[in-house]
């Protein structure tokens, strides 16, 4: 399972309505998405939820097709609600699971199964791995490194393997998980914004 994730710090100064480019919305969103944004009771959160859905889908799509580039309007968000959305792109259809609070929004995207299950059923199903957000307000160091270390801790715990045996390599900008002895099929995505880091991984361990 290919996975992509994105976190947005809703309180970060650079993400506030008066800080973004005046044409940001027009460049990022389709006509239907703009109508939804204009009609939203919470346009600030709606804006960054749409964005996180697109960004997380891009990360998942890039793993399927390395030639995919991030042109936000080409990632079309449909059926957005509190729990998730479906995103359409030339690379395929993707299901996005959403979590949010007053401080952040977190999106996790995976390719849509051909089994035909409803999106609402998929987003409510148990996640085969871990998807978490952590504050780094008091942490020191590079947020990318913090996200990586926390994700590796999570993978080791979730897969019941020794933390020292979990290794992370980069293929381009895509993280890949390696093990010394055990065979793992793990797909990992990392993200950070403002005071938050996030990760999502899915996988299984072979006996």
Where are these regions (language model features)?
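Core catalytic alpha/beta fold that binds nucleotide/phospho-ligands
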Residues: 1-207
